[in-house]
Structures are given as C-alpha cells and as structure tokens.
Amino acid sequence: MNTVLSRANSLFAFSLSVMAALTFGCFITTAFKERSVPVSIAVSRVTLRNVEDFTGPRERSDLAFVTFDITADLQSIFDWNVKQLFLYLSAEYSTKNNALNQVVLWDKIILRGDNPRLFLKDMKSKYFFFDDGNGLKGNRNVTLTLSWNVVPNAGLLPLVTGSGHMSVPFPDTYETTKSY
C-alpha cells in the first residue's frame, strides 16, 4: 500500500462498496410499501364499429372507441425512491375464440414533481381497441382496469393494479356514422 495507484484503488473499492450498501438500503426501506390506491373509473360512451381488418385475412373486425373518466390520488405512492409512474388503462374480456384478451387503451407517465392527482374527464382511447374478430359486439363483461409500474431509483420494478375497476357492457349494434 505504498504507491499512489494502490491507495487510489483501495479508496475506489471502498467507495464502491459503501455506495452499493447505500443503494441496497434505499431499496430495502421502500421494498415492502403498499403501492395500491383507490381508483374510480367511469365510462360515458362506447362506440362500436365493424371495420375491415387489413392485418390478416380480409375479414371484418370490431373496433371500439371508449370515452372514460378517471379519478385517482397517486400522492401516497410517491416517496423518495420513486422516479416516475407509468400508468395504463387496460380492457380485459373473453370471447369464444380467446379465453383472455387484454388491450391497452390509454397510458400516461407521471414524473416526480408532476401533479399526481388524476381528475380526467371525457378522455378518449389513445390506442385503437381492435378485436381480432367480432367478440366486442354484445359483450357484457369488458373490464377496464387502471394499473401502473413504479419506476424506482433503486430496486425492483413492481406492477401494481389500482383497487377499482369498471365492467362495461358493449352495445349490441354497430354504429355506422362517422362521429366520434
């Protein structure tokens, strides 16, 4: 331990060990925190169309447009180890061809420092809600759920589902007008 390089190496190794221990401490202090909050989802309008599907055989598929409201207070999720939240609204339903279908309709990233209270009114689907067939027409159990990924500074990336969902009955007829 006489040379400058060996002393610098020892100092660097010790500093790296201390930083690793501090990072683990940051992770362990928030690892078991409950990240679920109450969520209120309301659907004000569902529009259903039967359109030509250009992704496969030339058959027609169901395309839905959903207008919804979301209310949630995500303030309690944010602590010193949360960098951001990735929120997404998904629809789950079953058809005769598929036991479980999951479609993401909308998403949003909330950074630390942004307003974590959601009061969203008359939001439209951000992404197309296609069914690979005609499974949406008359479907009585399409469930909308708000979920989020907590992106931490250190630690695991948990997937959390909000404690509130909405089951929406879809219409029995297709809309033919071009209003949305």
Swiss-Prot record:
Keyword field? Endoplasmic reticulum, Glycoprotein, Membrane, Signal-anchor, Transmembrane, Transmembrane helix
Q: Which residues cross the membrane?
A: 12-32
Q: Where in the cell is it found?
A: Endoplasmic reticulum membrane
**Which membrane topology describes this protein?**
Single-pass type II membrane protein
User: Cellular component GO terms, alphabetically?
Assistant: signal peptidase complex
Residues carrying a glycan: 141
What does the record say about tissue specificity? Expressed in hen oviduct (at protein level).
- InterPro entries from the UniProt entry: SPC3
- Per the record, ranges on the Lumenal side are 33-180
One GO process term, biological-process aspect: protein targeting to ER
Q: Does the keyword Membrane apply?
A: yes
> Which PANTHER family is this protein grouped with?
MICROSOMAL SIGNAL PEPTIDASE 23 KD SUBUNIT SPC22/23, SIGNAL PEPTIDASE COMPLEX SUBUNIT 3
Similarity annotation: Belongs to the SPCS3 family.
As for what it does, the entry says:
Essential component of the signal peptidase complex (SPC) which catalyzes the cleavage of N-terminal signal sequences from nascent proteins as they are translocated into the lumen of the endoplasmic reticulum. Essential for the SPC catalytic activity, possibly by stabilizing and positioning the active center of the complex close to the lumenal surface.
What protein does this entry describe? Answer: Signal peptidase complex subunit 3
Q: Which organism is it from?
A: Gallus gallus
Organism taxonomic ancestry: Eukaryota, Metazoa, Chordata, Craniata, Vertebrata
Whichever gene encodes this chain, its name is SPCS3
